[in-house]
Amino acid sequence: ILGLLKGISALLS
């Protein structure tokens, strides 16, 4: 689940 958060964070970045 942490990977998902990191992935979304990268997209928003």
Curated annotation (Swiss-Prot):
Which Gene Ontology cellular component annotation is one that this UniProt entry carries?
extracellular region
Kindly list the places in or outside the cell where this protein is found, as annotated in its UniProt entry.
Secreted
Q: In which tissues is it expressed?
A: Expressed by the venom gland.
Record carries keyword Secreted: yes
Q: Which UniProt keywords apply?
A: Amidation, Chemotaxis, Secreted
Q: Which residues carry this modification: Serine amide?
A: S13
Biological classification of the source: Eukaryota, Metazoa, Ecdysozoa, Arthropoda, Hexapoda
Q: What is its main location?
A: secreted
This one is known as Chemotactic peptide
User: Which cysteines does the record link by disulfide bonds?
Assistant: none
- Could you confirm whether the keyword Secreted appears in this record? yes
One GO BP on record is: chemotaxis
